[in-house]
Amino acid sequence: MERKTFSQLPLGVSDFHKLRELGKIYVDKTGLLYDLITTFEKVFLARPRRFGKSLLVSTFESLFKYGTRDFKGLAIEKLWKDKTYKVIRLDFSNLKDFSTEEEFSFLLDEYFAILMAQNEITVSKEKSFGGFSSFMYWLGLQPSNSVVVLIDEYDAPLTVCMNNPGLFDFVRKKLSRLYASFKNYEGVIRFLFLTGITKFNKTSIFSELNTLTDISLSPRYGSLLGYTHEEVEEYFKNYLDRSAKALGIGSEQLLDRLVSQYDGFCFEETVREKVFAPWSLLSFFAEPERGFKNYWFESGGRPYALLEYLKSHALRHPEEYGNLKSIALSELTSSSDIKNLSDVALLTQAGYLTLKNIVGTTAYVSYPNEEVKTSMAQL
């Protein structure tokens, strides 16, 4: 019985249909999703790695593609009345294995050719220009308000070449064509959602898609990803009890230690809502007898390309970032040019630093918790 109960952790499951089908625990955020979808049509959300962005994209995909099939018992089940749509899901984490302009062009065409085949998208031979261009041509032919576009890790191919300005600019220009098509054919798109880590400037996302709403620091959606203290106690009570028993400590002492180790991430500008790193918390619950390990940083919070860029530009002494740092709030709310990228802004968007306070137009940031603090000291 215990084995069955504790197999319900959603650790490593980023497919919403699979999560629901297997009976994994799902912290119900669908009330927020409904609010988001019915308020905005084009949305951007920046969050660190391992915070559930891919699961969120998968949740949108299931809702728009299959309606409430996978949402039985969740808040949105009784609220959702919309029809189903053609859903195009783009995962740009598949566009990272390149080191030259030619390799990226080939990778991009190949990716979109596979995407079109998987989605049974065809164009006439005389209009077939390679996967990338053919997809944009197809999009322009679709009926009004008929397509949902979801982009996961939009910035992945850009992050790979942050240390190569020429290649970065080439990739930026290539992807700009795609984002420009979303602007040109916006009447076709019912809902557009982009997610990533960093808000790069001059990628035609934030300049051409001027109707794109950035909710990254919105107080309303500060807990959209990550677990609040209340959610942990409600959805993971059995795991809290089991973990306290495994470590031989009281439940209150356990919660205090979990807060210190894995909580403290703040993604909204009132600085009131704090959330746990979900990957760290779930990993701890899976093996509490191992103690309070540094799960987030080792599993995905340490992207090689990002750290290499920081080390070559500003991140000489990671321990210095343990002190409270000040930064203009506009550096977090506005998109960044790669040539003038602030190390503090980049570290904050990547999750190494988090909001501690905002006074006027100045944000104060520092390490969110002990896990990040100790991991950064080991760089």
Positions of predicted regions on the chain:
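Phosphate-binding site recognition
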Residues: 1-379
